[in-house]
Amino acid sequence: MPAVSRLGDMSTGHGCFPPTDMVLTPITKTFFNNIRAGVMDSGCQFTTHSCGIVVHPQEERFVSSGASKTYIEGKQAARIGDDIGDGDAIAEGSANSFIE
């Protein structure tokens, strides 16, 4: 089972686009290791990244897939391996909290 992703966890990067961190989450009451949880939502965003002159802006870099059975504050939980809207994926998560 993959680990739950949280605010500050990193993406994998893709092609020549570097990894970046999760900088926004709409979650306000659910924490893993004292860090707010990530979820599948356009408000759960990763930092802008670029490759040469091509830029993937933050508002296009949101978690676009999540757990099918685990919900956090009504939204699908984000985990290591889940997709980010621009072709990237979540690379980091909690060291001790795992879900389907």
Predicted regions, residues:
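Intrinsically disordered, low-complexity proline/glycine-rich segments
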Residues: P2-E100
